[in-house]
């Protein structure tokens, strides 16, 4: 069993989309999970399907949504790092890595889940993935936690190969949907479409709710 898992993503809802089922499987097994969330996603364009947020209220709404999503996934240790949404690419990578390294030293994880650098599509995703790698690279090789990274670029398999970690989350997909639903301001319309596709047994949607895949980060 894993000693401790550290999840590091820049935005509320990244964790639910990318690893919500995997996280729930871990917490159901009694594995301690810490989530370091970089921002409150305050620059997101979605304000709810039937608009209920504005630029002033969205940070507070998304903070509450994040806490509710963590509850659905069984996460009891949530760290909000306080960076500003859509600016992580402009932060000094060592400064961000310092924040992450401090948490690594505190919780001593055996595994870290984050975005694969340059395969996160969004600049914040790539910046946070780079910062995680920088933080872990400072550790002696024999002490480094394994990094299971999420890759969402279209050419990911051509560049990285097939994912070497594929988790069957079918027994907890309802918790993944609950976590996604907690991020209502961002996901309400998407989930209505998802539930319709589930009802119609859409193959791609059913696969998405059954499997989560990761690439073990390869050190140079």
UniProtKB/Swiss-Prot annotation:
The keyword Hydrolase applies. Zn(2+) binds at residues 11, 14, 125. The keyword Cell membrane does not apply. SUPFAM superfamilies: LmbE-like. It is an enzyme of class 3 (hydrolase). InterPro entries: BshB2, GlcNAc_PI_deacetylase-related, LmbE-like_dom_sf. GO terms for molecular function: hydrolase activity, acting on carbon-nitrogen (but not peptide) bonds, in linear amides; metal ion binding. Its cofactor is Zn(2+). Keywords: Hydrolase, Metal-binding, Zinc. NCBIfam families: thiol_BshB2. PANTHER family: N-ACETYL-ALPHA-D-GLUCOSAMINYL L-MALATE DEACETYLASE 2-RELATED, N-ACETYLGLUCOSAMINYL-PHOSPHATIDYLINOSITOL DE-N-ACETYLASE-RELATED. Belongs to the PIGL family. Involved in bacillithiol (BSH) biosynthesis. Catalyzes the second step of the pathway, the deacetylation of N-acetylglucosaminylmalate (GlcNAc-Mal) to glucosamine malate (GlcN-Mal). Has weak activity compared with bshB1. This is Probable N-acetyl-alpha-D-glucosaminyl L-malate deacetylase 2. It comes from Bacillus cereus (strain ATCC 14579 / DSM 31 / CCUG 7414 / JCM 2152 / NBRC 15305 / NCIMB 9373 / NCTC 2599 / NRRL B-3711).
């Amino acid at each position: 069993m894993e000693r401790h898992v550290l999840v590091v993503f820049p935005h509320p809802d990244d964790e639910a989309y990318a690893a919500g089922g995997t996280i729930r499987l871990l917490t159901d097994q009694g594995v301690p999970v810490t989530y370091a969330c970089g921002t409150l996603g305050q620059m997101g364009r979605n304000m709810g399907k039937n608009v209920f947020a504005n630029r002033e209220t969205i940070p507070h709404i998304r903070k509450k949504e994040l806490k509710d999503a963590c509850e659905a996934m069984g996460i009891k240790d949530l760290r909000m790092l306080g960076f500003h949404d859509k600016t992580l690419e402009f932060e000094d990578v060592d400064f961000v890595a310092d924040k992450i390294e401090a948490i690594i030293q505190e919780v001593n994880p055996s595994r870290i889940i984050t975005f694969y650098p340059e395969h996160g599509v969004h600049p914040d995703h790539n910046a946070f993935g780079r910062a995680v790698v920088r933080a872990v690279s400072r550790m002696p090789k024999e002490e480094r936690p394994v990094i299971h990274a999420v890759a969402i670029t279209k050419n990911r398999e051509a560049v990285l190969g097939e994912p070497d970690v594929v988790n069957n989350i079918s027994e907890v997909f309802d918790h993944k949907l609950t976590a996604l639903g907690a991020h209502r301001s961002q996901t309400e319309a998407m989930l209505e479409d998802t539930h319709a596709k589930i009802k119609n047994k859409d193959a791609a949607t059913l696969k998405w709710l059954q499997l989560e895949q990761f690439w073990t980060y390869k050190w140079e």
